[in-house]
From Swiss-Prot:
This is Uncharacterized protein YBR209W. It is a single-pass membrane protein. Keywords: Membrane, Transmembrane, Transmembrane helix. It is found in: Membrane. GO terms for cellular component: membrane. The chain crosses the membrane at residues 29-49.
Amino acid sequence: MNAYWFHYRASIKKEAPNYKRTFLGRARNAFLLILSEAYLLFVFLSYLIRGKSLEKRVNDEAKCSQRCVPLQLANNLAFGDRHKRSANFKKGIANTHSSLICSKP
């Protein structure tokens, strides 16, 4: 029974070596750890930047409230072709005519 157990354990080690004990295993684990931390840092920074840009956009809209134009007029300015304008209105880009957007100076 004892010899069988040791033989069984040795066969398991041959098929699936313990990655934590070898140099390549440690390097692999360190690389995966660094990769996961870099991904988490990227996600955190993207949310931070997105929050800053949203805050900046709200501030810009508050600053240019005197220069705002109706959305329908802005759509007419953005799309010169009449057919494109009507297609975009049908798609719902300009779903409300009372909405205001800021015109660029």
